[in-house]
């Protein structure tokens, strides 16, 4: 194999190979990153997606587009099924990610319909695990980093907002399963065990065996108040469901931060 470091928004002159599968995962995914690199985020999910589609078409390969639960925005339907069109602020700050991923889905859908692209779309919900960047700005990485440094946990809003955290190994199993079938999707990949951020802090306190102080800040604009996937489609088509519970996953993640 060969590693190629390449900006996929530029001409892909070095990529002259045939591939069995193209996994298109290129994009910032944490809010601080995609807000900081807003234009780059929109470019990679539009221009970059088109370029990778061309690679897949030339190779006649399976193409897996990594979409996101963010396409549902701040959902008014709960849990979220794949046929829910979402509640997205198209001009809000988060739209650089939400809308560019929705546009990416539109691109993939067009080429699947009109040019027989063998495509699959997966909508990835909140994921965590070892090797998570401690400074990427997502809540689990932030809370663990701050707890290890005996700092107050930064909590935006009142902590009642919910998330459904999926361990990385479970997500990878779902991605591999999607690559082995001809299903287009979209298919939700996430954990159905919903938890509030306040409850997450309690879980971390039980692991660290200490009280964790919090520093409350204003809620972030357009931050979803609830998020939970309906994964019945993934269970039916991929025979997939998460296996790792949150406590075990958090312990593995914390251990990796301490290495």
Locate the predicted segments by residue:
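N-terminal Rossmann-like NAD(P)+-binding domain of SDR-like oxidoreductases, especially those catalyzing
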Residues: 1-127, 169, 256
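C-terminal substrate-binding subdomain of Rossmann-fold SDR/epimerase-dehydratase oxidoreductases
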Residues: 2, 6-7, 126, 145-259
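Short aromatic-enriched loop/helix-cap "lid" or pocket-rim segments at secondary-structure transitions
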Residues: 15, 75-78, 133-135, 200-201, ...
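A short, amphipathic alpha-helix embedded in the catalytic core of nucleotide-handling enzymes
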Residues: 52, 111, 139, 143-146, ...
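Short clusters of hydrophobic/aromatic residues that line enzyme substrate/ligand-binding pockets
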Residues: 72, 78-80, 132, 153-155, ...
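Residue-level signature of the cytosolic catalytic core of signaling kinases
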Residues: 92, 132-136, 193, 242
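Hydrophobic alpha-helix immediately C-terminal to the catalytic Tyr-X-X-X-Lys motif of short-chain
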Residues: 103, 107, 111, 143, ...
């Amino acid at each position: 194999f060969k590693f190629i470091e390449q900006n996929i928004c530029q001409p892909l002159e070095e990529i002259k190979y045939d591939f069995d599968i193209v996994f298109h995962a290129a994009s910032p995914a944490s809010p601080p990153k995609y807000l900081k690199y807003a234009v780059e985020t929109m470019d990679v999910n539009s221009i970059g997606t088109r370029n990778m589609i061309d690679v897949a078409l030339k190779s006649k390969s399976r193409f897996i587009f990594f979409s996101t639960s963010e396409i549902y925005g701040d959902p008014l339907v709960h849990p979220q099924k794949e046929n829910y069109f979402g509640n997205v602020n198209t001009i809000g700050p988060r739209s650089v990610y939400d809308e560019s991923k929705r546009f990416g889905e539109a691109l993939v859908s067009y080429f699947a319909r009109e040019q027989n692209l063998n495509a699959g779309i997966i909508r990835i919900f909140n994921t965590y695990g070892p090797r998570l960047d401690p400074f990427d700005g997502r809540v689990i990485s932030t809370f663990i980093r701050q707890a290890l440094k005996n700092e107050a946990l930064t909590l935006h809003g009142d902590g009642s907002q919910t998330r459904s955290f999926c361990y990385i190994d479970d997500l990878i199993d779902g991605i591999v399963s999607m690559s082995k079938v001809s299903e287009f999707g979209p298919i939700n990949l996430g954990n159905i065990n919903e938890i509030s951020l306040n409850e997450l802090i309690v879980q971390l306190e039980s692991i660290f065996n200490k009280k964790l102080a919090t520093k409350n800040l204003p809620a972030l604009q357009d931050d979803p108040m609830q998020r939970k996937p309906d994964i019945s489609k993934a269970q039916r088509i991929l025979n997939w469901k998460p296996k790792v519970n949150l406590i075990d996953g958090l312990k593995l993640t914390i251990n990796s931060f301490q290495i």
